[in-house]
């Protein structure tokens, strides 16, 4: 999802049950949110990241699997209970 900053859409998206939306402005954030939080939606700000960087962020997000580590799985379970 894209808006000017990405903040509002990420907040709104996270109100939907089952959505774990992460606001990312760099590839490392995209990688870590997939690895550790199993984020299933990406938010970006068009006024924050340029086109080439946005493509790199999306590619990283889509190509990074969830780590499956127990501590990360527990975290996701706690998030889902909220």
Question: Model-derived features: where do they sit?
Answer:
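Short hydrophobic/aromatic-enriched beta-strand-loop microsegments
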Residues: 19-26
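Structural motif
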Residues: 2-3, 24, 44
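Glycine-rich phosphate-binding loop
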Residues: 1-16
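Short, structured coil segments at secondary-structure junctions
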Residues: 17-19, 37
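Short, flexible micro-motifs
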Residues: 9-11, 21, 48
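C-terminal binding/interaction regions
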Residues: 27-82
């Amino acid at each position: 999802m894209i808006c000017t900053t990405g903040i509002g859409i990420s907040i709104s998206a996270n109100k939907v049950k089952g959505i774990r939306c992460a606001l990312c402005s760099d590839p490392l954030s995209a990688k870590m949110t997939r690895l550790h939080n199993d984020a299933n939606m990406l938010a970006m700000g068009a006024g924050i990241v340029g086109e080439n960087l946005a493509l790199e962020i999306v590619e990283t997000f889509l190509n990074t699997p969830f780590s499956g580590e127990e501590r990360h799985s527990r975290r996701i379970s706690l998030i889902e209970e909220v």
